[in-house]
Amino acid sequence: MKNVAPKLEDSVYERNFADINPRLTEAQALSEAARCLFCYDAPCIAACPTAIDIPSFIKKITTGNLRGSARTIFEANILGHSCARVCPVEALCEGACVLNQEHKRPVTIGALQRVATDHVLDRGIRVLEAGSPNGRRVALVGAGPASFGCAAELARLGYACRIYERRTVPGGLNTHGIAAYKMRAPEALREVELVRSLGVEIRGGVEVGKDVTIEQLRSEANALFLGIGLGPTESLRIPGENLSGVVDALHFIDRIKNEPFRRIDVGRTVVVIGAGNTSVDAATQAKRLGAESVRVVYRRGPEDVPAYHYEYELAKSDGVVYVFHTLPVRFLGDGALTAIECVRTEVTTDEKGRRMVRAVPGSELRIPCDMAIVAVGQTKAVEWLTRHLSGLELDRGRVKIDGEGRTSLKGVYAGGDCVNGGREVVNAVAEGKAAALGIDPDLGHPRA
């Protein structure tokens, strides 16, 4: 990278990456909890993929029973602590709050959920216990939200669970792929310990398919769960991607999450390609690391931005500038990036009425920059799946399952991003739980 932004004072880094949603005080929590109407057949529960009994945990906060509140949360969602910080609550539980219909501010469910879960984790209070051993074993691939959701549910039913993870540090995107100002890695690792406290074994630094085979796992366990997530960031497949200064958004976010801020170089002028939630995390953090200019280049218009609205607004409030209807075609530079060659685009419709992006002839332009962060989605794990699980049925690169996580292979289950193509942490946990409730009756424990 030719032009690196000057390093900031440590105090500035800490201020820039401080918790974007600070913890409520006890008085604030009690006041906010009192606003809940404790609805019967509460729409907030239906809006939560893990179906946390939200009125119940909030009611317990009003009576000072934070331990019971946390138990209600963790029984439904083993990653309820993380989800309190990173869930898109505006689109889920808080968006469904009935107070919205009265044109009032919804109950800040996420903040209250954090109060309860922080209380028990800060004090080392155990609220969940493993079930009596039933003699059955389950192997899980990938130590992320889906596997945690599955393993925690199974452990409470008495199963011996062992998770295999390629990385040495478990946690999936919670640990490696979410902006540091939303949740620091140590917070995510507290929930990893919660999973371990149920007797779940996590073997890090073990690559399934290389260090141990799928056949070995299937022979040693009664069931196999795939929680492998997605692959690396998609390539743009344009010239110059190997230039110094062109980086993968997920790798960039991972470094910010797990290394000292001062160690991470960022360009003076940065361009982020793509406009999803990962793009926002990359762009805002580049700005907070000291980049003088950060622009997001997107081939469609503002009405098509895939990031959640509040994420989009956060980026703009941080000084990130959006450049719409612009498509990169080449990275320019002599060893190090100096500019991106782009073309303007327009959105048209084809004969079937589908909206299509078309390059405008003669509209070439160059955007000078020192750093380009590619955030255009992740690849699917098709190659790994087809190589190691012959006969596994896929749907557009995603593992095909039924409503309880069963794949086309007997004894093999799946959930999370490898199934849904990349959704939220809470969706992955929910799919892991659903698979556990499919595994249990399949292994001889029918539900009443």
Model segments located where?
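N-terminal Rossmann-like FAD-binding beta1-loop-alpha1 element of flavoenzymes
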Residues: 137-162, 279-287
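Residue-level detector of alpha-helix initiation sites
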Residues: 78, 144-146, 169, 276-278, ...
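Conserved hydrophobic helix-helix packing surfaces used for dimerization/oligomerization
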Residues: 138-140, 161, 270, 294, ...
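Ferredoxin-type iron-sulfur electron-transfer modules and their immediate structural context
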Residues: 1-137, 224-242, 327, 332-337, ...
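FAD-site-proximal beta/loop scaffold in flavoenzymes
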Residues: 242-267, 350-422
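Glycine-rich dinucleotide-binding loop and its adjacent helix/turn
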Residues: 115-132, 193-210, 233-289, 394-408
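Rossmann-like dinucleotide-binding cores of NAD(P)H-dependent redox enzymes
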Residues: 160-163, 167-198, 202, 283-330, ...
